[in-house]
C-alpha cells in the first residue's frame, strides 16, 4: 500500500469519510485521495514523493501559486505579534480599505471566516433589511452549507448525488426558490408568484460549482433589472470569482452592480477568510449599528488579515489577470484540439483564471441540465489517467479548475501533451 492509502485507511477510522470536506474523498471519481506533503508554485507533492501540476489550487485561493513568499512572510511576521486578540486591529482597517477600494460596489465590508459565513450572513442581512423571507437561488449553484442554501445545490452535493441534504427542515427550504441558471423567464415567474415576499437573489456570476458555466450576456443585467422592479436585493457570490475573473470580480467583468457581494478564497491568500459587503444603507442594518445580528470569535483574525492583505496587494499588480487569461485560454484551446484529434467530444468553458472540462456532444454548456447530461464516467477515467501523468485536476466532474500565475506556459503545454496521450486511451 502507498503512504496515501495507509493514511486514508487510518483517517476513515477517525474522521467521517476520512476527510474534512466531502469532495476531497474522491467520491466523485473513485479511488484513494492523495495526501499532500507540501506545495510550491504550481506544484503539489504527495506523501509518496510524486509531483503534480495543480489545477485545484486549494479550490481557488492559490491564484498566485502555492507558498508565495509575500504571503508566507506576512503570516510569519504577524504570528510573531500574537495569534488572536479578540479585539480590533489596524490590519482590519487596512484590509477593509483595500477591499472596498478594489471592489467599488462595496461601500462597507464585514470580515468573516469562510465563504459559507459570508453568504449565510448576507442572506440574513437581506432578509432583515427588506423584511421579506424568500430568496432565489439557481439549480447547481452552491453558496456554502447553510441550511437555506442546500436546495438543488452544486459542488459537493452534486458529487455525492445529493442535491438536497438530510437535516434541512422543510420549513427552512420552503423559503428558498430555485430557478434555472441563465434563464430569466424562470426568475420572472418566481417574482410574479411572490411579488412582495422575495428578499434577494443570490447568484454565482460564473457558476463554478457545476463545473464552470459562464452567464449568457443578458442574464446578470436581467437579474439586476428584476430585483429593481420587485424591490429585492441582488447578492453576487464572488467567493470563487472575486479577484480572479477580474481584479474587481466578475461583477466588473460583466458590468453588473450588486447590492451585496460575498467574498472568500483569494481574499484570505490561503487562510480561512470570507467577507460580505455592499451598499452603506444595507450594511448599516448590521449589528452593532443595526438590528441584524452577526458575529465571530476569529473574524478579522490578525494572521488571516495579514495573509489576505499581502495576497490582494500582489493580485492588484499590473498584468496578473492578463497572464491568468492567457494561460487559461491556451489550456482550454489545447485540450479541445487534443480531444478533437482523438475524436473525443469535449467542451471547455473558461473565464479569466477558471475553466471547466465537459465530456459532451453538445455545442455548449450553459445550465444545470447541460451539465447533468455530460459523460461523468468518461471524466472519471480521464481524471485518473491524468493523475498518472502527474496532472492534478478537481476530483469531480462538477468542480471548476483554477489557474495560477505560477503556472508556466511549459506547464500548460505539458498538460496538453498529457491529455493527448490520455485521450488516445479513452
Swiss-Prot record:
Enzyme class: isomerase
Pfam families in alphabetical order: Aminotran_3
Lineage top rank: taxon: Bacteria
Localization in the cell: Cytoplasm
Listed EC numbers: 5.4.3.8
Predominant location category: cytoplasm
Cofactors: pyridoxal 5'-phosphate
GO molecular function terms attached to this record: glutamate-1-semialdehyde 2,1-aminomutase activity; pyridoxal phosphate binding; transaminase activity
Recorded catalytic activity of this chain's protein: (S)-4-amino-5-oxopentanoate = 5-aminolevulinate
Stretches assigned to coiled coil: none
Pathway linked to the protein: Porphyrin-containing compound metabolism; protoporphyrin-IX biosynthesis; 5-aminolevulinate from L-glutamyl-tRNA(Glu): step 2/2
Family: Belongs to the class-III pyridoxal-phosphate-dependent aminotransferase family. HemL subfamily.
Protein name (record): Glutamate-1-semialdehyde 2,1-aminomutase
Organism whose genome encodes this protein: Salmonella typhimurium (strain LT2 / SGSC1412 / ATCC 700720)
Amino acid at each position: 500500500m502507498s503512504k496515501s492509502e495507509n493514511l486514508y485507511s487510518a483517517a476513515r477510522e477517525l474522521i467521517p469519510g476520512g476527510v474534512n470536506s466531502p469532495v476531497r474523498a474522491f467520491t466523485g471519481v473513485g479511488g484513494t485521495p492523495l495526501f499532500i506533503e507540501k506545495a510550491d508554485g504550481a506544484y503539489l507533492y504527495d506523501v509518496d514523493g510524486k509531483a503534480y501540476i495543480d489545477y485545484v489550487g486549494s479550490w481557488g485561493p492559490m491564484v498566485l501559486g502555492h507558498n508565495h513568499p509575500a504571503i508566507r512572510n506576512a503570516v510569519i511576521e504577524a504570528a510573531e505579534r500574537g495569534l488572536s486578540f479578540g479585539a480590533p486591529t489596524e490590519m482590519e482597517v487596512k484590509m477593509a480599505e483595500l477591499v472596498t477600494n478594489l471592489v467599488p460596489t462595496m461601500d462597507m465590508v464585514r470580515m468573516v471566516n469562510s465563504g459559507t459565513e459570508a453568504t449565510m450572513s448576507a442572506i440574513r442581512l437581506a432578509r432583515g433589511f427588506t423584511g421579506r423571507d424568500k430568496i432565489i437561488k439557481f439549480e447547481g449553484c452552491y453558496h456554502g452549507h447553510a441550511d437555506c442554501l442546500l436546495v438543488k445545490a452544486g459542488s459537493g452535493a452534486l458529487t455525492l448525488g445529493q442535491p438536497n441534504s438530510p437535516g434541512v427542515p422543510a420549513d427552512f427550504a420552503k423559503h428558498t426558490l430555485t430557478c434555472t441558471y441563465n434563464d430569466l423567464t424562470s426568475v420572472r415567474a418566481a417574482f410574479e408568484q411572490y411579488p412582495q415576499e422575495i428578499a434577494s437573489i443570490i447568484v454565482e456570476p460564473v457558476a463554478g460549482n457545476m463545473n464552470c458555466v459562464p452567464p449568457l450576456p443578458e442574464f446578470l443585467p436581467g437579474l439586476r433589472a428584476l430585483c429593481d422592479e420587485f424591490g429585492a436585493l441582488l447578492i453576487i457570490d464572488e467567493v470563487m470569482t472575486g479577484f480572479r475573473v477580474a481584479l474587481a470580480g466578475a461583477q466588473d467583468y460583466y458590468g453588473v452592480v450588486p447590492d451585496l457581494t460575498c467574498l472568500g478564497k483569494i481574499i484570505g491568500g490561503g487562510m480561512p477568510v470570507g467577507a460580505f459587503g455592499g451598499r452603506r444603507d444595507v450594511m448599516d442594518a448590521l449589528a452593532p449599528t443595526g438590528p441584524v445580528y452577526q458575529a465571530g470569535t476569529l473574524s478579522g483574525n490578525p494572521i488571516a488579515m495579514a495573509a489576505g492583505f499581502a495576497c490582494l496587494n500582489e493580485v492588484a499588480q499590473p498584468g496578473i489577470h492578463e497572464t491568468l487569461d492567457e494561460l487559461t485560454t491556451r489550456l482550454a484551446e489545447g485540450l479541445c484540439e487534443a480531444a478533437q484529434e482523438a475524436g473525443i467530444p469535449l467542451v471547455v468553458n473558461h473565464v479569466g483564471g477558471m475553466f471547466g472540462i465537459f465530456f459532451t456532444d453538445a455545442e455548449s454548456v450553459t445550465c444545470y441540465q447541460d451539465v447533468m447530461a455530460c459523460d461523468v464516467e468518461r471524466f472519471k477515467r480521464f481524471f485518473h489517467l491524468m493523475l498518472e501523468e502527474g496532472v492534478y485536476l478537481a476530483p469531480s466532474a462538477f468542480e471548476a479548475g483554477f489557474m495560477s500565475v505560477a503556472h508556466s506556459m511549459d506547464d500548460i503545454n505539458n498538460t496538453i501533451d498529457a491529455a493527448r496521450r490520455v485521450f488516445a486511451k479513452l
